[in-house]
Amino acid sequence: MAKKRRSKKSQKQMKKIISLILGLIVVVAVGFFGVESGIIGGESSLVPLVDDEHAFSLHMIDMGQGDSLLLSKDGKYALIDAGETMSPGERESREAIFAYLDSLGVKKLEFLLLTHQDYDHIGSAIDVLKRYDVGVVYDNGVEHTSKTYENLMTYLAEEDVSYKVVRDGDFISSPWSGVSIEVLSPPEDLIYKGKKADVNENSIVLKVTYGETTYLLTGDAETEAEEYILSTYADIDADILKAGHHGSSSSSTYAFLKAVTPDVVVISCGADNDYGHPHIEPLENFAKFTTADKIFRTDIDGDVVVTTDGTEYSVAVRNAPHDASKILISGNGVKV
């Protein structure tokens, strides 16, 4: 089941050596963000990739204390999670997601993948389905009794929306040439705590690869899911890591990060959130593998876009320039 990538570790080390330091380089780009701050692997100069029509991009939308990630390439788009952080009837996160997608001219989503059933990941899903043409909806198939999830499943059935359950070992049908989307978790028999399948631990974890660049997207996967992935796959090395569970101490263990060895870490969390995300423990762990100028947080940076042409990758932030001095401070104000 494990797959080997030729000299990936050495490629990443070379990228780190010749990467430019974020915060010192700011390049004006003709793009959505106006200014691009970034790191580039494989080149000695900053090359804006956001507007390269053949590049692949991960967009982490600043939608508050939740998740919504947009994938894009060649004018085709897909959404991973569509959360809502407010109580029903107050739709601030939904509006942030809509504003972002509309600014890019998105009309169709090739797929909507919901990593798990929590409100901060699916609360805006029905609204997304009503507003955009969605090809297929994926989730993990875990039974859940929340009204939000029940309403979603009813909507999918009534509107005859294509729906598929994915588990470890599956591949998402990629709408983009050269892009592979592999499901690493949850396991087929799921992860249980007591008599119930745990919602966070059964998050869909994706390994997205384009050329020599790999993204690891972890939803709210926690320690047991990380242990399962470590025990199942020999190679989970990735260039870009989407931190699990909004930077919670329940995720991003040292052992997991040692296997991933991320160069860039992106964290989705709301400003002044009630959970203290990101917690100090994962920040300490991230700092052992990369530097603050390569760790990005939506509560500080706003929307974050990581773009690759398959060899090089760059990072753009809405609140440019990226302020690395604020990154390694937890949501509770504790500094690494």
Q: What residue ranges belong to the model's regions?
A:
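Non-globular, low-confidence helical/coil segments that flank catalytic cores
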Residues: 2-336
